[in-house]
């Protein structure tokens, strides 16, 4: 391999496309659940999946696979968090369709968020601020900043896991689907924005970060 080839930069996904890839499958899930009967009447093959939540689950799996495929084709890499989330979607989605039991897809956010929270907080026990490995390309922080941010995100992921359990066990399926899209995302965005003071306080310039 030549030096020029070795130095060839990776293709970066634009922020807008990244947002579409992350939110697209969720929007498909919401639309398919709310319009499941209409989709089943227009596309008989979908009717074989079952009721609206099962049609939504099948299309959610397909949209997730498409999002991962687009990400891979553009960057030749798959971000760790979307990859783990995608694997859980495929496993729990398949169980949902196979057993015709929507409990599995409802538990997917609980499993994913608990896993992320446990990994982040567990890494701190070994002196590793794992969040830095995920977001190091986005911004540079000192060690204390990464540690604090890792703690906050770890706790936040566990909070989302508990919140999902409360919602799906206490409310209807339609409410849970709507909250998954219109509740969880705004909460996550607000939490992310709330971390900006910490990020600015512990930011280091590129020269000091080397």
From Swiss-Prot:
GO terms for cellular component: plasma membrane. Coiled coil: none annotated. InterPro entries: YciB (IPR006008). Keywords: Cell inner membrane, Cell membrane, Membrane, Transmembrane, Transmembrane helix. The keyword S-adenosyl-L-methionine does not apply. The chain crosses the membrane at residues 12-32, 53-73, 78-98, 115-135, 153-173, 175-195. It is a multi-pass membrane protein. It comes from the Bacteria. Pfam families: IspA. It is found in: Cell inner membrane. Belongs to the YciB family. Plays a role in cell envelope biogenesis, maintenance of cell envelope integrity and membrane homeostasis. This is Inner membrane-spanning protein YciB.
């Amino acid at each position: 391999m030549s030096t020029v080839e070795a130095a060839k930069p990776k293709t970066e996904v634009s922020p807008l496309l990244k947002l579409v890839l992350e939110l697209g499958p969720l929007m498909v899930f919401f639309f398919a659940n709310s319009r499941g009967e209409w989709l089943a009447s227009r596309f008989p093959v979908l009717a074989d999946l079952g009721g609206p939540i099962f049609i939504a689950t099948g299309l959610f799996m397909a949209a997730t696979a498409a999002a991962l495929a687009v990400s891979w084709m553009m960057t030749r890499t798959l971000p760790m968090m979307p990859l783990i989330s995608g694997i859980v979607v495929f496993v729990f989605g398949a169980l949902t369709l196979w057993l015709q039991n929507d409990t599995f897809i409802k538990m997917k956010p609980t499993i994913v968020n608990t896993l992320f929270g446990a990994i982040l907080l567990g890494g701190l026990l070994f002196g590793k601020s794992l969040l830095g490995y995920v977001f190091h390309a986005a911004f540079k922080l000192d060690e204390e900043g990464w540690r604090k941010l890792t703690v906050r995100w770890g706790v936040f992921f566990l909070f989302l896991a508990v919140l999902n359990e409360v919602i799906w066990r206490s409310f209807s399926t339609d409410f849970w689907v709507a909250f998954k899209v219109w509740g969880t995302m705004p909460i996550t965005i607000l939490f992310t924005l709330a971390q900006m003071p910490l990020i600015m306080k512990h930011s280091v310039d590129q020269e000091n970060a080397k």
